[in-house]
């Protein structure tokens, strides 16, 4: 077996389904040499049963659905699958990701050229087509962490001294040695992982990828950034502005410092805990301000932002739009008839909040290329799966009963 892919799921079954579909649309790789483990952490949306129905073992013998009786966390769930994996390479993959048809081919081909590879990551793209800065990160040492918390990395993003957290001084289009690989897409070899060890289960939800990446570096390996694109919705499993996220993330960083920078423990403990409190207060203020804004300026009577569907299954999409009360315009097209995608529109793409591409008529690679070549912050990627009858956007999921 060449590759074992591990996906940890918690209440995002439709994203897992879409992710699995993108895996099986991969080109340039032998799908019979790929096994997939989906570890369900006691989801409340009936994920395990749903996925087993959509991907029956008779048709997908290499997809294994593992179920836990409680939410054991990200690291422990991954470790459960690692023990069952048979692949030469192991890929840790978030459920809210979408692979292009060439993502796996590109990353596996690149491993042949990488020297002493520990872990490798890819160029992650947000749903508006912009580059996700967490695709490349430096080790969050006390200095690097201070620069981030103090905002110095934002003031001097290209500086190797102040801007190392996101390493924006590196090209996004070149293979580069980096420090930290995002757990959203993290490829390693089974051999290297055996030497370094699995995920530290002390971490529950955040920080595991930072810890594992750092352990590879300390063991003498090199970590790499590979500029092949991947869509990462990010935020569907968690809400980044919530108190819970802020608290759990910074607590994870405190665990990281205690583990790897023991001699700084006393000095770092207070500022990190202070950061937790300050960021939590900021998150609460932002949340309450947004709620107040919605209360004072209700959307009643205001025309909702429109969506655009591009594909050949408009009749089915119209049924979904009617059921959910969506405002959708329709353009019958495919890659051949519309080679520039939504950039061919006579009106500005910013007229729409979502541009929904039918993945039966357009490849994922085509869709990401169109959004990446000219991102609009207010215009988001949407996908429609005609076979399943599901529209997936960054904020909502709509499906035909």
Label each PLM-derived region with a short phrase:
Residues 7, 12-27, 320-321, 342-343:
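Short, well-formed alpha-helical segments that are part of the catalytic scaffolds
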Residues 65-85, 106:
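Glycine-rich, basic loop-to-helix element that forms the pyrophosphate-binding segment
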Residues 214-290:
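Active-site-adjacent helix/loop segment of glycosyltransferases
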Residues 90:
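Short aromatic/hydrophobic "clamp" motif used to bind/position activated sugar donors
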Residues 22, 40-49, 70:
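A conserved acidic beta->alpha catalytic loop
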Residues 98-134:
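Conserved donor NDP-sugar-binding/catalytic core segment of glycosyltransferases
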Residues 21-33, 324, 373-374:
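Short, acidic, metal-binding catalytic loop of nucleotide-sugar glycosyltransferases
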Residues 139-178:
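Short, flexible, basic/aromatic active-site loop/helix in glycosyltransferases
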